[in-house]
Amino acid sequence: MEYIIKNGIVYDPLNGINGEKMDICVKDGKIVESVSDNAKVIDASGCVVMPGGIDSHSHVAGAKVNVGRIFRPEDSKREIYAKKGLRTGTGFSVPSTYKTGYQYSEMGYTTVIEAAMPPLIARHTHEEFMETPQIDKAAMPLFGNNWMVLEYLKEGDIKACAAFVAWLLKAVKGFAIKIVNPGGTEAWGWGKNVHSLDDPVPYFDITPREIVRGLAEVNELLGLPHSIHVHPNNLGHPGNWETTLETMKCVEGVEAKPRVGERETSYYNTHCQFHSYGGTSWKDFESKAIEIAEYVNKSKHVVIDVGQVTLDETTTMTADGPMEYDLHMTNGLKWANCDVELETGSGVVPFIYSPKGPVYAVQWAIGLELFLNTNTDKVLLTTDHPNAGPFTRYPRVIAWLMSKKYRDEWLYNKVHKWAQQRSHVADADKEYDLYEIAKITRANQAKVLGLSETKGHLGVGAEADIAIYAIDPEEKDGKKIEKAFRYAKYVLKGGEVVVKDGNVVKEVFGDTIYVDVQVGEDLMNEVLKDVGEKFRRYYSVNLENYPVSDEYANSWRVIKIDATDIN
């Protein structure tokens, strides 16, 4: 199928295109120089054209997501999705799989990264990926509390750890190294936690600092497309900004060396809003977002996503088990907890971010401060879906960023006065333009994930994942901005029109992306002996039953990396 998108106002930061009126040609799922006279015309006059959106951190599939669905029937009743010719769906903060795919597609998103996959339960994640239409997917396995990783890093054996990581990524069809509360979730298995970068992990004699730096070195030795993806210790605690800065600093000097992609950073700090808290308790709680932003701006190795609080009732879920228990003790709502053998653990707790709550108002302001004070090449839009709010609120966040008037309407009329008193968001006059919105929703993601060869831009050879929005580039009405980005005029996925006038008109199933790194054969064989012994002694499954087989995807996209020099 051939298309020509005519007269659109194009925003494509990876190619330096900032609001130019131009035509985009599509053929056989790719963007091309030209098409035949038989090409179908999409009239984008007066509309904005961007690459398909990319969500670099979201919880959309797998065990804890399904727990969130099961134990929150009240959430499933909040929003029912019934469209002629499509699958129905339910759920507001934890939507069902089909609804997840449809709603991302409505907003112009075409690629989503599942942010935390327990390796032992990876098959569950991939099963749900197969039932999530409209988007390409990838999942990040959890490594920061894995017994094998802790032991190799304690011994200082970076090469063996790298071989283990390479084996696990291929075995569970994973994309990147995810680290959550390094050492703390393992400690939670004993009813404990770690509270600083230098607290030893019980029974392993290794510290979070050594885990984070060690895995950063492993990542760059392997040359993975994405950097380490880090949820630091002490999430959600007053005063944690110091831990956040120390964690960022602990990988200084670890140079980005991707063998695939154009990534320049070696450290990705996710949901940074939850890690930018000042004060010593909730009584003197305050923002330290500007201090975090200042460090990020001057540090080549760091990039952040925000995790913007949207002031909704939502469902929190994370592999930071002790944090979820603390949350449960704070709000008294129901709590689910799970330990995943030698690998990780997690928790799920409902949460209500009331705009009239003083702490929640400051959390809201902290996220906006990060957006408004961080270099737009180094910040990415997320809500840590569903933890700070559902992904369907991205359009509202975009409206807050583009319109100071809309932002101030919330600041002065809807949220608690602490947002004014304990942050600097009221002082921020900055308003994002559409070029910057394109950066923080697609271009930056493509680059830091190592996918920018074919994703996140509209150059010739790129995948024809395209979003068209009915919005004037000069628009400052927050509600109009929000509506335009919530329901795209057109969306193309793989060169096919899948959304028209905000409605899904065609169901497609994207690829599941994973990394296959080949290291030296002798080194891998030695590591597999260790792996086999661990499975025999400790795991509840046999090693032969552990890997995810090829049947668990609609279609795989494999990023192959030759790292056989590691031996």
UniProtKB/Swiss-Prot annotation:
A Pfam family it matches: Amidohydro_3
GO molecular function: hydrolase activity, acting on carbon-nitrogen (but not peptide) bonds
Highest taxon of source: Archaea
Listed SUPFAM superfamilies: Composite domain of metallo-dependent hydrolases, Metallo-dependent hydrolases
Similarity comment text for this entry: Belongs to the metallo-dependent hydrolases superfamily. FwdA/FmdA family.
UniProt name for this protein: Protein FwdA
